[in-house]
Amino acid sequence: MDFITINSSNKTEEFALKQVAKQATSSLMYRLGKTIILASVCVEREPVSEDFLPLVVQFLEKSYAAGKIPGGFVKREGRAQDFEILTSRLIDRTLRPLFPKDYRYPTQITLMVLSHDIENDLQVSALNAASAALFLAHIAPIKSVSACRIARIDNEFIINPNTSLLNQSSLDLFVSGTKESLNMIEMRSLGQKLNALEEPLMLEALELAQKSLKETCTLYEEVFTPHQNELLFKESQAIVLNERLLDLLTNQYFDEIIKGIESSALSERENVFNEIAKKISEAHSEFSLEEIEWSLEKVKKTEIRRMIIQDKIRPDKRALEEVRPILIESDLLPMAHSSILFTRGQTQSLVVGVLGTDNDAQTHESLEHKTPIKERFMFHYNFPPFCVGEASSIGAASRRELGHGNLAKRALETSIKNKEQVIRLVSEILESNGSSSMASVCAGSLALYASGVEIYDLVAGVAMGMVSEGQDHAILSDISGLEDAEGDMDFKIAGNLEGITAMQMDTKMSGIKLEILYQALLQAKEAREHILKIMHEAKEKIVINFSHLPTTEIFNVAPDKIVEIIGQGGRVIKEIVEKFEVKIDLNKPSGEVKIMGNKERVLKTKEFILNYLHSLDQELEQYAIDEVLEAQVKRIVDFGAFLSLPKGGEGLLRKQNMDRCQVVLKEGDSIKCRVISFNKGKIALDLA
């Protein structure tokens, strides 16, 4: 067993090698403060034949890590929580570009959180633990990678803030990469205001992150290299393409390949290439269908990249900086609180907005919070198969859908003025040809406005791409699905005219240089300004139907009156809700009553509640202490009997008073009682 301590970027990390899980290809125990993560890498020895990287990353939180027992009926960890899925994606997107393109061995990376002290960053810790375990496994020539988080407090950037500092920050920037370049970025603005960050400041933050990553990665390589396993897989698994077949495709079928490239829809493009493959297979039996399909993909990709780099033209004939045509429609769904249909080229997002009460907020359990937290702004993204012409059923939300919804939420969250308002936006992707998450951001921002939600500003999103060949590269604005598939970078950027509120960068290369990222940021700003201009024009045409929107009325009563509004077993409040068709939130300690619904019904509900409480007070005023009266048994309970009083209202005769007099009562009996006290609006009785 070996112990390694590394000090870098405001943190002291400890690694225990060969201590646990020794049957894995590699494993380690990572420690930062009182946060402990078990990282393991397992690799199959037989490669798969399919053309993809068979990598699976799983990040798992254990409730005991924070001294908790899982909430809910089943006291065992079950389905992965959103944070676990998003963190798994974060690590996967960082590590995937590091693998050789011909690597085909099934690989599983597992991160288990065994202890967490709340203050240390779980995502940075998990990624660094995964990176170290992968580097030690030495399954292929893979560079060391690390992560850091940048916060901004009082105009000062802070590297790797703890949770307390991050809660004070206006910026949450997560960056991972090697010592030479960046290969994954997640960013969002934080705080009560919009806090969009300008491009020059974003570059400054990224430069700081790059410096931190270089320091950490250099230390990792120096310290971990002596402990690496022997290189596991040296031979190449790359498919060798037939040169004669490539010549045949280039000379005889090139025009048909160009036709397929220029097809806008994925289904249409696939049909064209399937027909080409079928035609060649029938005419040239010496080539297998698999060989033909591989070669077709190679020729297609080479030509697309050549067009972009050399001809400065894209498959759909757009210029490199050109955004596809945009059409915005509003108020399509009469029963929703808002609905916006945003169409950009062949990508179409229908975002529907609904406002709710505090009871509608999503509750989450988290290791990073001592008590369950309420998510008041929800953004759910759905990608049904028909949006790309696929004939398959719709199932549960995928990792990708959760990730895209989270990105859109992060882009819009700080634009909302009232952070206590409960809002749910749902993006239904009806057509997709790239940049659907950014279309969701645009439609979502307008849907907030159309719902009557007060916002600081509209937010627009655009996906940027890049194609790189040697020393040459081209930045693309508003990438299509084909450009995303054949390009080297997917850089989603959202914000307003002043700056950026969220961004996400992934790459298929081992990393992207800062100067290229900054060029993409500036080009994205131009595209964003163009989109925002169209969105502002659409905003002016939106007519907010305030009569249809729910309104909220908040008032206070004496805290001891809340139980009267609830009633026995919730009977009174259920009747009120059913009668007036509203939602009611009650706060017992403060006496606050919050009613939400149609404006007219809300006002009638408030009037009813106040009149109801007043009538109860009047009933009490009719009786005096020591007054003797004839009452009727209304219902028997474990602790006594509730009696109907002759002048209205009811009183409680407690069981001990009945037992003292050896009286046995049944419902409907009449009995003489004496008023002995008034307590919190209740009349206490004794036998006369």
UniProtKB/Swiss-Prot annotation:
SUPFAM superfamilies for this protein: Eukaryotic type KH-domain (KH-domain type I), Nucleic acid-binding proteins, Polynucleotide phosphorylase/guanosine pentaphosphate synthase (PNPase/GPSI), domain 3, Ribonuclease PH domain 2-like, Ribosomal protein S5 domain 2-like
Domain KH: 550-609
Annotated GO biological process: mRNA catabolic process; RNA processing
Lineage: superkingdom: Bacteria
Catalytic activity as recorded in UniProt: RNA(n+1) + phosphate = RNA(n) + a ribonucleoside 5'-diphosphate
Keyword RNA-binding: yes
InterPro entries: ExoRNase_PH_dom1, ExoRNase_PH_dom2, ExoRNase_PH_dom2_sf, KH_dom, KH_dom_type_1, KH_dom_type_1_sf, NA-bd_OB-fold, PNPase
Major location category of this protein: cytoplasm
This protein's GO CC annotations: cytosol
Cell location: Cytoplasm
Cofactor(s) needed: Mg(2+)
Annotated Mg(2+) binding sites: 484, 490
E.C. numbers: 2.7.7.8
Alphabetical UniProt keywords: Cytoplasm, Magnesium, Metal-binding, Nucleotidyltransferase, RNA-binding, Transferase
Single GO molecular function: 3'-5'-RNA exonuclease activity
Pfam families on file: KH_1, RNase_PH, RNase_PH_C, S1
Role: Involved in mRNA degradation. Catalyzes the phosphorolysis of single-stranded polyribonucleotides processively in the 3'- to 5'-direction.
NCBIfam families: polynuc_phos, PRK11824.1
The protein's name: Polyribonucleotide nucleotidyltransferase
